[in-house]
C-alpha cells in the first residue's frame, strides 16, 4: 500500500483510532491483499484509493467487522476487533455504504430513522443542527419537507452525510461519499469533513474522486 500525506491537520493527534496490522483478506482462491498495514489517527480524514477490485470496500467492511480476516489484526479505538467485540466497536462508528437504502417516503421521516435505533438514541435528533449541516453542504432547507423520490441522487447523498454527522460518532466510515456530486458539491463535502475532523471526528473513506482524495489529510492507494 502506498501512502501520501496530503494536508496534515494543524492539530495533528498521534493517538491511533484505527490500527491495521499485517492483514490479509481472501475470498476462496482470490486474495485481495496480503500483509497490509494502515494507521488512522484521531481527527484525520483518510481516503483509500485504488482500481476496481483492489479491495477498497472490503477493507472498510473489515474495519466494521463485516468481512473476516485471513491474517492479521484490526484495532479500533484501542479495542481488538473480534466476534465478541464487534458490536461494541460498531457503536462507535457511523457507516454510510455506497448503495443507500432509503425506505421512507418523506425526507423528514428518513432523517429521523437513525435516531430511533437503540445504539443512537443518546445522540438525540436536532433539526436546528441538521439545517446547519444542510447549509454547509449546499442543501436547501425546504428539502426537509420533500418526498424522497423528489430528491436527486446527489442531494440524497449529502442529506445522509448530514444525518450521519449528527449522530456524533467518533468514527465515520463512508464508501464513495461524492460519487453523485459535481465539483462544487464535492468541495462542500471536503470542507464539511474538514470541519468534522477539526472537532475530533475521524473519517475513513473510499473514493475514485481525485478532487475529494486531494482534500483529505492522507491518501492510501491499494
Label every PLM stretch briefly.
Residues 18, 33-35:
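Conserved structural motif at the start of ABC-family nucleotide-binding domains
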Residues 105-120:
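Q-loop/switch helix immediately C-terminal to the Walker
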Residues 164-165:
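ABC ATPase C-loop
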Residues 147-151, 155:
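Conserved ABC ATPase signature
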Residues 64:
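Helix-to-loop junction immediately C-terminal to a conserved catalytic motif
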Residues 125-143:
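Conserved ABC ATPase "signature" region
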Residues 172-176:
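Catalytic Walker B motif of ABC-type/P-loop ATPase nucleotide-binding domains
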Residues 72-80, 89:
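Conserved ABC transporter NBD signature motif
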